């Protein structure tokens, strides 16, 4: 796992920030049918901290913004890592920190705001889709009947999963509309084949890339499009997480 790229810098017209991929004790949900990203974890919290500290030592504060991602949610980062993040953020005068989390951990967000008092915190949720049947019966996200409006009360950013067999273009466009209505920023992660049984719908993906919607979204500063198989025409994330399968959907 340690051969992954865990530090990067995003610097384009959409956003400027440093990104770190840390390691936690493991996604507490870990039941999403499309995701094998959760294999990057270790129950040994001291080992996690030692690895995470080395990654965090690379942070310079160049853009005053830091995004912290992991294989699950912020609650699965050990306490020493959280303390070290706070130390680095304070020393580097970083004004905004972005964490990711599963909807099931929404009630812990208020405690993070207390810990990082005086620092602007933003939170990403991997809603993947707002189609209730697709989200719960097919993707098995474990978010119950939560609506985009209720989700946005806790999270100001969302990841959307696109390009898997069984999804329709119409439902995808509805996801985009709802995402832009209720969230500050959305990230469209185009499904990349991994160790799960989910398959990429290349016909659907190409329909998107040949559409006016794609060009409009690519030019929208609130939207990031990531496709590991088409990096030349989509946005980048500085290859953080490179070296093994990562479909991009957060918890």
Question: Language-model segments: what does each one mean?
Answer:
Residues 44-46, 79-80, 137-139, 169-170, ...:
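Short, flexible/disordered intra-domain loops and linkers
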Residues 37-52, 59-79, 89-107, 120-146, ...:
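Core AdoMet radical
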Residues 77-86, 106-116, 170-172:
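Distinct, well-ordered alpha-helical segments
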Residues 143-200, 209-232:
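Conserved C-terminal portion of the radical SAM core fold
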Residues 81-89, 168-188, 237-251:
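Short, electropositive alpha-helical surface patch
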Residues 86-90, 112-117, 148-153, 215-218:
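Surface-exposed amphipathic alpha-helices with a cationic face
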Residues 1-9, 90, 192, 199-251:
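C-terminal accessory extensions appended to soluble enzyme cores
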Residues 4-50:
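Canonical Radical SAM [4Fe-4S] cluster-binding loop centered on the CxxxCxxC motif
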């Amino acid at each position: 796992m340690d051969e992954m790229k865990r530090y990067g810098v995003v610097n384009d017209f959409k956003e400027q920030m440093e990104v770190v991929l840390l390691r936690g004790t493991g996604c507490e949900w870990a039941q999403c049918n499309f995701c094998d990203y959760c294999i990057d974890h270790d129950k040994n919290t001291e080992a996690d901290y030692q690895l995470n500290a080395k990654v965090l030592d690379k942070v310079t504060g160049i853009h005053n913004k830091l995004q912290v991602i992991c294989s699950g949610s912020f609650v699965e980062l050990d306490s020493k890592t959280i303390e070290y993040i706070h130390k680095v953020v304070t020393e580097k005068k970083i004004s905004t920190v972005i964490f990711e989390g599963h909807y099931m951990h929404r009630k812990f967000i208020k405690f993070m705001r207390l810990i990082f008092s005086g620092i602007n915190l933003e939170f990403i949720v991997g809603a993947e889709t707002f189609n209730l049947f697709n989200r719960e019966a097919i993707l098995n996200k474990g978010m119950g009947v939560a609506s985009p409006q209720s989700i946005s009360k806790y999270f100001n950013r969302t990841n959307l999963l696109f390009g898997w067999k069984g999804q329709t273009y119409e439902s995808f466009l509805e996801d985009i509309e709802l995402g832009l209505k209720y969230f500050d920023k959305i990230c469209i992660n185009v499904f990349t084949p991994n160790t799960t049984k989910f398959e990429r719908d290349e016909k659907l993906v190409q329909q998107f890339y040949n559409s006016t919607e794609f060009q409009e979204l690519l030019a929208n500063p609130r939207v990031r499009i990531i496709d590991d198989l088409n990096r030349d025409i989509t946005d980048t994330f500085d290859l953080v997480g490179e070296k093994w399968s990562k479909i991009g959907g957060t918890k």
